[in-house]
């Protein structure tokens, strides 16, 4: 039976190896030290000392364990305790595209995930009056953020979750529904699909491969279904793609919560604005 001299509460060598590899650092050389450091770092000045001591004991005995971000950053000089951030696409302008890119990079550098609803961006091909050109549409912008997620990792080691959504009525929804249908997307003259190449090399670049995607369904969609009993072609295609590929997912936002279209990839938090974070 496994028994550790330095961390007697660990029941296997895997547990101790994981602790040593991911969470052990100066000032937190053992599990007990990490528990004390974490509670002092996060709770000092917020709860009475007796409660802090009780919390430390619960953690040492593994009756309560905080999220991995808290374990990793406890006592470090630059702590980033928040797991995910909600970012808002305000308007389809060069300034907003640039601002969203900056926000996304800033969050991803901390190892935090991001969630964005792109429904306010104009459909691809829309005329841009100021320049006479045409709009790229939301999907290329999703691709840009996806690329940021591919190359920007916190500490050079931790990838972050990315979430992107689009309203079911958006003019680009047909393209969005199949953007990750990789088996039906050929790559150049190779005769192979993105799906084929992904199976050969998991890290092969494919459309939105760093991003979880979902379709937003609002009150109008729900009321239409109640009146007609028909879910509509977008929903049926959504179901087909979800069954075939696992995505897009379904984001339901009805009535007083209709505008709460922002969420992180795991959906612990949903919101209308971008001031909310996930800190689980």
Please report, for each region that a protein language model flagged, where it lies by residue.
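Extended catalytic cores of very large enzyme megasubunits
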Residues: 1-280
